């Protein structure tokens, strides 16, 4: 699994499952990413609030798709909505190493210990540890860290990995289909499987 430099870019992002899903189905129908980008600019296929927002969404969706082996497209199309949301989350983890580490350091550890919730104290420890490990994270403002945490919580909730309540959030161990498990292993993404299940 490739590790990218840490980035705080996710403060501008959403889970964008419906947009990701639409783009993947267009790929499955034979369109290229370049054609989808052009179509997005011309017709606002994601119903974005502005051309700038449409460009941001398309750029991020394309980046997530590019991060996965093309064989994920038929897997995505054949999966149920639960599986599709997991694949969207996996794409987020592949493109955002800081988010992957958040899941790996908090969700994986909690599940491995037999615990089924995490809270703000866990997030604070994560940021404290990362500030020691990375100058880039150390230079993030408190406001940026809070916005990143909000984004990460949204990703996990929208993917069905956690509940969405305020305060401590219950962790829901995902039921991952055998096809997705096999695909993750085949493409050296076992660390993501472990991060999401704790085993």
Tell where the protein language model's regions lie, with residue ranges.
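Eukaryotic partner-binding/assembly regions in large regulatory complexes
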Residues: 1-86
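Helix-boundary capping/turn motifs
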Residues: 12-16, 31-32, 94-100, 126-130
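Short acidic, glycine/proline-enriched loop segments that cap or flank alpha-helices
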Residues: 111-118, 136-144
